[in-house]
Amino acid sequence: MPLLDATRRRAGLLLALAAASLFVGTAAGADAWPSRPITLIVSFEPGGSTDISARAVAQALAVELKQPVVVENRTGAGGRIGTKAAALARPDGYTLLWGSGSSLTAAPVLYPDQGHVATLVPVSLGATQSFVFVTNPTLGARTVQEFVALAKRQPGQLNFASAGMGSSNHLLGEIFLAATGAPVVHVPYKGAVMAKDAVIRGEAQLMDEVTSPLIGALRAGQLVPLFMTGERRDPAFPDIPTAAEAGLPEMTIQGFFGLLAPAGTSPDIVARLNEAMRTALASEPVAKAFGNLGFTTAYSTPEQMATRIAEGRATYARIVKARQIRVD
C-alpha cells in the first residue's frame, strides 16, 4: 500500500506540475503578444487613400507594439475580398484589417455573401472623411436648390455618375435623390476617376466623392461644389456649405476608416491594440499623412466604432429598400 500511495502521489504531483506549466505557458503567450510581425490587410489597391492611410498607421503601430506591421493589399470586388480574408483569419492578433466604411456598411447590405463582415471585432476608428457633391460648371447651378430646380424642369435629362452599382457614392447619391426628389438618372461608371471625368466633360451633371480625389478639379474650377456631408465645414474648403447648411441635415454622413480584428480575438489584445491606436493616431507622421489626404483623425473606443458601423448599415439598408437597389 505505501508503494501504491507513493505512486499515486507522484502521479498527482506530475499532473499538477503539467497543469501549472500549461497555465503559465498560456499566460506567458498572451503576455508576450506580439512576438512576431503583424499583417494589416488593406482591401484596396496600393497608392489609394485607404492604402496610404493604412501604411501611416502601420508604421506608427509598429513603433508602439515593437513589432513590424506589414500592409498586405488583398484587392478585388470593391474591397469585399480583403475584408472576407481578414474576417476568416485566425483570431490570434497577427492578422488585422484596415477597414473602410463602404466595406463595413454598404457591402453587407447589398451582398448576401458578406455576412462574415458582421463578425469582425472593432478596435478603433482611425479617420473620417466628408463627401462633396459636385456638378459641372456649365450647368449653371451653384446651390442644391438651383440644381434641383434645373433637374425638375427637365426630368430624366440630367445624369448622376457613380463609381459603380452599390458603391458608397452610389448609395449616398440615392439618399440625395430621395431627399430632394430630383428626377436624375443614375449612370454607374467603372470607378470614381471615370465618374469624375464624366462630370468634368459634361456627360454627367452630378456626383459625390470623398474630397481628396477632387481637390485638383475643385481648385481648377472644373467642378462646382454644392455641399459637403461633414458636420462642420472643411478648413481646406471653407466656402463649401455643410449638408445641414444646404437644407439637407439627413445627409450628414461621413466616410470612415478603422482597425478591426477577426472574431474571437482576445479582449486583452483588442484593448492593447486600442491603446496603441490612441498613441499612433496622435503621432505627427499620421497627422501629416491624414492631413494630406483630407482626413480627420478619429480615435474611438471599440464600442463607439461598433455603433458607427451599425448606424451606417441601418442608413444604407433603408435607402436600398426604399429605392429598390439591386446589384448583380
Predicted regions and their residues:
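An extracytoplasmic/periplasmic, membrane-proximal ligand-sensing/linker region
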Residues: S35-P37, A179-T180, P267-D328
